[in-house]
Amino acid sequence: MRIGLTGGIASGKSLVATYLEKQGIPVVDADKLARQVVEPGEPALAQIVATFGEHVLQDDGTLDRKQLGAIIFGDEQKRKQLNEIVHPAVRQSMKKQADLYEQRGYTRVVLDIPLLYESNLFHMVNQVWLVYVDEATQLRRLIERDGLTETEAKQRIAAQMPLTAKKAQADVLIDNNGTKENTYRQVYDALAKTAHE
């Protein structure tokens, strides 16, 4: 079974992913793969430079994430262009990793995909687990975690699909507004149910 783990920005998805790994469930991290596919020498980086210009590279030839972020956040068309380059490369890597885990005998593999809904990747998973927090908590965590201004944080939240729409399509909802222990209990219960499916 492939479980799609997702959640809004700063919802606590990483907390859940770490807990799942500690339970012996392999987690394939889309964000980690997204960083790997844009390393120097990778085809996706060459496409990004061709699309957005040399100024998105640092002096050492690596991607200047801050520069690229400034270009795409708040510009729907440019963000779409970037996604059309990076997402296919990430999907291919995720599938390859999940296949390897299943070949090794794992019956459950988690695909940690922040933009599962936005990229319509339901076909890659059997179940969708959504980690969520209320908007005020999300905003506070994002400002604290990434050192953003309130305006920048609100822009990043607005760039994602609304939580209410995501909840309607999720198989498992994980409320991360409370304590870590409460979140862990919800994940443990959800795992117990999947053991019989």
UniProtKB/Swiss-Prot annotation:
Leading EC class: transferase
GO molecular function terms listed in the Swiss-Prot or TrEMBL record: ATP binding; dephospho-CoA kinase activity
EC number: 2.7.1.24
Keyword NADP: no
Sites where the protein binds ATP: 10-15
Catalytic activity: 3'-dephospho-CoA + ATP = ADP + CoA + H(+)
Pfam families: CoaE
UniProt main location, coarse: cytoplasm
The protein's annotated pathway: Cofactor biosynthesis; coenzyme A biosynthesis; CoA from (R)-pantothenate: step 5/5
Database matches in SUPFAM superfamilies: P-loop containing nucleoside triphosphate hydrolases
A GO CC term assigned to this protein in UniProt: cytoplasm
Entry keyword set: ATP-binding, Coenzyme A biosynthesis, Cytoplasm, Kinase, Nucleotide-binding, Transferase
Protein's cellular compartments: Cytoplasm
Any one Gene Ontology BP term: coenzyme A biosynthetic process
Domain DPCK, chain residue ranges per copy: 2-197
InterPro entries, sorted: Depp_CoAkinase (IPR001977), P-loop_NTPase (IPR027417)
CDD domains: DPCK
HAMAP family, alphabetized: Dephospho_CoA_kinase
Entry's family note: Belongs to the CoaE family.
Function, as annotated: Catalyzes the phosphorylation of the 3'-hydroxyl group of dephosphocoenzyme A to form coenzyme A.
NCBIfam families, per database record: dephospho-CoA kinase
Name of the protein in question: Dephospho-CoA kinase
Species in which this protein is naturally found: Shouchella clausii (strain KSM-K16)
Gene this chain is encoded by: coaE
